[in-house]
């Protein structure tokens, strides 16, 4: 447990900028496990707070003012596409040739798709996905997790019940760590700081550590109120493109992609959260998955 917490706290990436959503896909195929890239970021950073662009396969191209010397300079394309000029010297986004992607430095750059195929890097994956645009295969193809594909064992019912215990505790600890280190870093808003301050100053708070699930379960019962805000906060961190009260597959990716290799119940957990099977996870579904009572689910806590 300690290993995956450390990994998540060290994750880094590039910018999340996807203005359109992608629903949760059907994930019936067998997928496999991996080791993910670790980069230098502030200790305590949430993987969805740092900028993670590896997972935005739903982003649209955005056009800005064309610079005369280089029309492509301010013409941004989504992952898998590059800017080229047409016969009128107008910039346009075209699919990137996978062979033009930088050579991977090591295994940590590899990614696994949901059809269980390993790609040398996210660049290779998105370039390949782009060439399949408009096809059924391309629509279903997603980046599943970071690292080369490996066998991921089935998630047993008993293991599934343990997953939210660890996840809840981790969310609380991430917030406390951000609060402790947030002097001039603007890691939290003032409203968020006020909420977390109460948790931080509570003497009954279970300190971060590799605790047995029995202790985590007891702590949730005894200190239930400490967990309400962290669960809402994480939903807000994920619900960004667009901010609509629902989590799509693309919005979940920054959290689930690094988790899957280390927590094999990740995919099944998020699937069970989607109670109405509409391929999106609403706030009430998300909070319910973490054991938050219906009366305590409040959209105003998503700040």
Curated annotation (Swiss-Prot):
Keyword Metal-binding: yes
Cystine bridges: 72-83, 77-93, 95-130, 101-123, 112-149, 155-265, 273-289
Domain Follistatin-like: residue ranges: 71-93
Glycan-bearing residues: 116
Alphabetical list of SUPFAM superfamilies matching this protein: EF-hand, EGF/Laminin, Kazal-type serine protease inhibitors
One GO location term (cellular component): basement membrane
Protein localization: Secreted, Extracellular space, Extracellular matrix, Basement membrane
Physiological role: Appears to regulate cell growth through interactions with the extracellular matrix and cytokines. Binds calcium and copper, several types of collagen, albumin, thrombospondin, PDGF and cell membranes. There are two calcium binding sites; an acidic domain that binds 5 to 8 Ca(2+) with a low affinity and an EF-hand loop that binds a Ca(2+) ion with a high affinity.
Name of protein: SPARC
Organism: Bos taurus
Biological classification of the source: Eukaryota, Metazoa, Chordata, Craniata, Vertebrata
Gene this chain is encoded by: SPARC
């Amino acid at each position: 447990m300690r290993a995956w917490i450390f990994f998540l706290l060290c994750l880094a990436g590039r910018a999340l900028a996807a203005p359109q959503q992608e629903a949760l896909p059907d994930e019936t195929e067998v997928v496999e496990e991996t080791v993910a890239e670790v980069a230098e970021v502030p200790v305590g950073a949430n993987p969805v707070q740092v900028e993670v662009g590896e997972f935005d396969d739903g982003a649209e191209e955005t056009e800005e003012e064309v610079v005369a010397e280089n029309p492509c300079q301010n013409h941004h394309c989504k992952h898998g596409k590059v800017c080229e000029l047409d016969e009128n010297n107008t910039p346009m986004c075209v699919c990137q040739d996978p062979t033009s992607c930088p050579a991977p430095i090591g295994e940590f750059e590899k990614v696994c798709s949901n059809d269980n195929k390993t790609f040398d890097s996210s660049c290779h994956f998105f370039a390949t996905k782009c060439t399949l645009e408009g096809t059924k295969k391309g629509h279903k193809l997603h980046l599943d997790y970071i690292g080369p594909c490996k066998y991921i064992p089935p998630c047993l019912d008993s293991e599934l019940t343990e997953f939210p215990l660890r996840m809840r505790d981790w969310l609380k600890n991430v917030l406390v760590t951000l609060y402790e280190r947030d002097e001039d870093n603007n890691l939290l808003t003032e409203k968020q700081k006020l909420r977390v301050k109460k948790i931080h100053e509570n003497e009954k708070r279970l300190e971060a550590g590799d605790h047995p699930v029995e202790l985590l379960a007891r702590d949730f019962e005894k200190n239930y109120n400490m967990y309400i805000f962290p669960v809402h906060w994480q939903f807000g961190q994920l619900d960004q493109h667009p901010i609509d009260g629902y989590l799509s597959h693309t919005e979940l990716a920054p959290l689930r992609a690094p988790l899957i290799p280390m927590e094999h119940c990740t995919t099944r957990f998020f699937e069970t959260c989607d109670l109405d099977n509409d391929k999106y996870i609403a706030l009430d579904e998300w909070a319910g998955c973490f054991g938050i009572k219906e009366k305590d689910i409040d959209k105003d806590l998503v700040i």
